[in-house]
Amino acid sequence: MLAKRIIPCLDVTNGRVVKGVNFVELRDAGDPVEIARRYDEQGADEITFLDITATSDGRDLMLHIIEDVASQVFIPLTVGGGVRTVEDVRRLLNAGADKISVNSSAIANPQLVSDATARYGSQCIVVAIDAKRSSAPGEAPRWEVFTHGGRKATGLDAVQWAREMATRGAGEILLTSMDRDGTKSGFDLELTRAVSDAVPVPVIASGGVGGLQDLADGITRGRADAVLAASIFHYGQHTVGEAKAFMAREGIPVRI
């Protein structure tokens, strides 16, 4: 079995790392370069860096911050937010990103995923899906895809959308439960399982980590290939090393 990855996530706006609850109520968590360096030293497998207001604000890419982070970090760096064209993908890769995450732009133009993977390879294109439960209690579970930092409903079914993106060449799915984001109540394991079982590519579980057991559950019960977390690492509740040691004790293969 391949080693499972632990990925700290840096949500960035106006050049600062922030953390919110259910995609709002953002509070400052520090300088992205400093935080990324700390996670690299702690043994993170990768870092995900999302400019969470670039799309909704219509802003350009934060290339200078990406260059600064990439110069300090020696593990794979995934960058997303405001990526609209294949040219944007090229600029971010040139700035030092290893993988590019697309979200709202993939829905506006699904061909972007096909074109970007054709040019740069599936291994560096991640499709981020922000999903919110849309089924009523007692109904078969359904989740709707949202865009623009969770502000815009699309009417798309999250599991079907993940399938389409994998068919178009996405190398990974970064799956965030909007219902769980920032709540520290654990991943939406039903959502994570539904998408993991539906696609042939790795799924990164995101949204809701409150403790180390939640990370392990994302792998063992959610069937994710990687787990992403922010606040438990940003505010010093746990280090990446502690998370890996816990997962190893749970019998999950990790790189120590």
UniProtKB/Swiss-Prot annotation:
It is an enzyme of class 4 (lyase). The active site is at D11, D130. The keyword Amino-acid biosynthesis applies. GO terms for cellular component: cytoplasm. One of its GO terms (biological process) is L-histidine biosynthetic process. Its main location: cytoplasm. Keywords: Amino-acid biosynthesis, Cytoplasm, Histidine biosynthesis, Lyase. Pathway: Amino-acid biosynthesis; L-histidine biosynthesis; L-histidine from 5-phospho-alpha-D-ribose 1-diphosphate: step 5/9. GO terms for molecular function: imidazoleglycerol-phosphate synthase activity; lyase activity. It comes from the Bacteria. Its EC number is 4.3.2.10. The keyword Lyase applies. InterPro entries: Aldolase_TIM, His_biosynth, HisF, IGPS_HisA/HisF, RibuloseP-bd_barrel. It is found in: Cytoplasm. It catalyses: 5-[(5-phospho-1-deoxy-D-ribulos-1-ylimino)methylamino]-1-(5-phospho-beta-D-ribosyl)imidazole-4-carboxamide + L-glutamine = D-erythro-1-(imidazol-4-yl)glycerol 3-phosphate + 5-amino-1-(5-phospho-beta-D-ribosyl)imidazole-4-carboxamide + L-glutamate + H(+). Belongs to the HisA/HisF family. Heterodimer of HisH and HisF. IGPS catalyzes the conversion of PRFAR and glutamine to IGP, AICAR and glutamate. The HisF subunit catalyzes the cyclization activity that produces IGP and AICAR from PRFAR using the ammonia provided by the HisH subunit. NCBIfam families: hisF. This is Imidazole glycerol phosphate synthase subunit HisF. The gene is hisF.
